[in-house]
Structures are given as structure tokens and as C-alpha cells.
A protein has these predicted regions:
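PAPS-dependent sulfotransferase catalytic core
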Residues: 1-124, 269
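PAPS-dependent sulfotransferase catalytic domain
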Residues: 104-122, 131-261
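A general structural signal for well-ordered secondary-structure junctions
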Residues: 39, 163-164, 301
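A short, structured active-site edge motif that brings together acidic residues
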Residues: 45-49, 170-172, 262-266
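Alpha-helix boundary/capping detector
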Residues: 44, 58-60, 170, 183, ...
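PAPS-dependent sulfotransferases, especially Golgi type II membrane carbohydrate sulfotransferases
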Residues: 1-17, 21-22, 34, 68-69, ...
């Protein structure tokens, strides 16, 4: 399907996007960014995921087909998201066709998810999204969203929004290897050349670590090449344990004046996850040395 031109809305400065692997600490970063005055959407779950992005883009089967067929199709979805969130840009038939297909595939279980959506969820989300498209509320300040899967779309987003800023949240790879949150491995692993070694829910630390490495390498390489200073790698472990080592850089990245910001309230949000350091309870000899060297090269101790 060939789509109409899908550039950013006139006057758009581009969104701030927060992505990373599920369970890497993106929720904490989203909470901090909200405290700093960035609008992340009206339809969020408890983890601060923007559910409109989830509906429109958490679709591995469609993504592979669209990028092979017509990469511009992906950008139609970006226009929908921007219009719904900040009332910028106009929609055409291609946009409503895009939305309709996303809803239909979600309802029929064709998103490529590891488990089906809750019955009625796609209709509820699309209803709120359509209402926002019809009665969109302008937001003049900084805006964006947090949805871990966003990093998969970094390349087309960088092409679509010249002013895009992206925060890639990364957590110790060995902690992530033993995470029960395997969703991205099963959804996107093949895109990165990583095949899950077991069914969803079954521990597969080597495959999880391989995906962590591949995703981080691609995000950082693409982010620095395409965005330069508008790309930030944020270390969750440091943020959660020593926020004052991270907050000044984050505030500078967001181009904010630190005077008057609720820094005490933000520091109070930074509490390490109970699972931090869980890798120490496991036998690391199950990992190949190449993977452990990659973890070390990215700045984490392996002990």
C-alpha cells in the first residue's frame, strides 16, 4: 500500500521519547520527566506506557511487512500519535486506514504478541484515541511518550521528526538476563538476529542477554549517528542509587533551567528495584565469555 506524504506537523519541535527493554527502569525515567513538565499523554497505564503507541506500533508482524513494503507507512502512525497528543497536523484516509488495521489486527490476535490482548482492549483504546483526534487539546510545552518498544522505531522516528530527542534507558545486562519480562525478546528478537531458546515464561538467560546486547548496540549506534546530542543513554542503576550523578545531565539534555525544579521530590522517586543485583544469585558460567565481555565493555562490572 502506498501512503500519502507523512511528514511532521507544521510547527512541531519533535517529541521526547523514552525507550528501552521492558523492566529496564523506563517507568522511573517517565515519572521524573513528568515532574520536569513534559506531557507524556492522557492514556497511560500504571507503568506510564503510552497505550496509543502500544496499539499503533507494538506490532512485530506488521512492522516487518511495512518496512519491506513501504517505510512511509510507519510514519502515518506517527502523524496519528502527534495529532492525538498535541493537536498538530491533519489526518487523511491513510491515517484512518492505518488505525483501523491496527485495531482489527489486535482484535483478531494478529499483532504478533506473545499473548492475546484483553477482550475489548483494542476497541476501548481506539475509542479514546478517536475522541482525542476529533477533540484534540493543544499542548504547547514539551511533549512525548514513554513506551519501551519505541527504541525499535528509532530510525524512522529520527527521519520523521528533525527535533526528536530520545532517551534510551539501560540496566545491568545480567540483571536483565534473568528478568521474567521476556516480551521484547519474543516480539523483536528475530529482528535483531536473536531467536528465543524456549517458550515465553521459561528462563532463557543467554538469549535474553544476547537481545540486551543487540538492542543496546543498535540503539546507541543509531542514536548517536542520527540524533547526536539529542540522544541520551541513561543508566537506570546509577539513577536509582545515586540520582544526583544523573539528574544534572538529564536536566541539561532537556534544556531546562534547574532553578525552581522539584528536585527533592524527584530524588524521592529514585528507589532501586528489589531485583537489582539479582544476577549475583545465579551461576554466570552459563554465559559465553563473549557476552560477558560485552557487558563489561558497556560499563558494568561482572562479579
Amino acid at each position: 500500500m502506498s501512503t500519502s506524504p507523512a511528514g511532521p506537523a507544521a510547527g512541531s519541535t519533535g517529541p521526547l521519547v523514552i525507550g528501552g527493554l521492558g523492566g529496564s527502569g523506563t517507568r522511573l525515567v517517565a515519572e521524573i520527566v513528568q515532574e520536569l513538565g513534559c506531557f507524556l499523554g492522557d492514556d497511560l497505564n500504571q507503568a506510564r506506557d503510552n497505550l496509543w503507541f502500544t496499539l499503533l506500533f507494538k506490532r512485530p508482524r506488521w512492522y516487518a511487512e511495512a518496512m519491506a513494503r513501504d517505510p512511509q507507512e510507519v510514519k502515518v502512525g506517527f502523524r496519528i500519535l502527534e495529532r492525538a497528543m498535541v493537536a498538530r497536523g491533519e489526518l487523511d484516509y491513510a491515517a484512518f486506514s492505518f488505525l483501523g488495521r491496527a485495531v482489527r489486527e489486535a482484535m483478531l490476535g494478529r499483532h504478533g504478541q506473545t499473548r492475546a490482548f484483553t477482550p475489548g482492549w483494542p476497541l476501548a483504546q481506539s475509542s479514546r484515541l478517536v475522541r482525542a483526534l476529533r477533540f484534540a487539546t493543544p499542548h504547547e510545552g514539551p511533549w512525548g511518550w514513554k513506551e519501551p518498544n519505541s527504541h525499535v522505531y528509532l530510525r524512522p522516528m529520527a527521519e520523521h521528526w528533525p527535533g526528536l530527542k530520545f532517551i534510551y534507558v539501560v540496566r545491568h545486562g545480567l540483571d536483565m538476563a534473568f528478568s521474567r519480562n521476556q516480551t521484547q525478546l519474543h516480539l523483536w528478537g528475530p529482528l535483531y538476529g536473536v531467536q528465543p531458546s524456549a517458550a515465553p515464561g521459561v528462563p532463557q538467560p543467554q538469549a535474553m542477554l544476547d537481545y540486551w546486547i543487540k538492542a543496546a548496540e543498535r540503539a546507541t549506534t543509531d542514536g548517536r549517528r542520527l540524533l547526536g546530542e539529542r540522544f541520551m543513554v541513561l543508566n537506570y542503576d546509577t539513577l536509582a542509587t545515586a540520582p544526583d550523578r544523573v539528574l544534572p545531565g538529564l536536566i541539561d539534555f532537556l534544556e531546562l533551567d534547574p532553578r525552581g525544579l522539584p528536585l527533592d521530590r524527584i530524588r524521592a522517586l529514585a528507589v532501586p528495584a528489589a531485583s537489582s543485583g539479582r544476577y549475583r544469585q545465579h551461576d554466570l558460567s552459563t554465559f559465553d565469555e563473549r557476552s560477558l565481555d560485552a557487558v563489561r565493555s558497556m560499563g558494568w562490572a561482572v562479579d
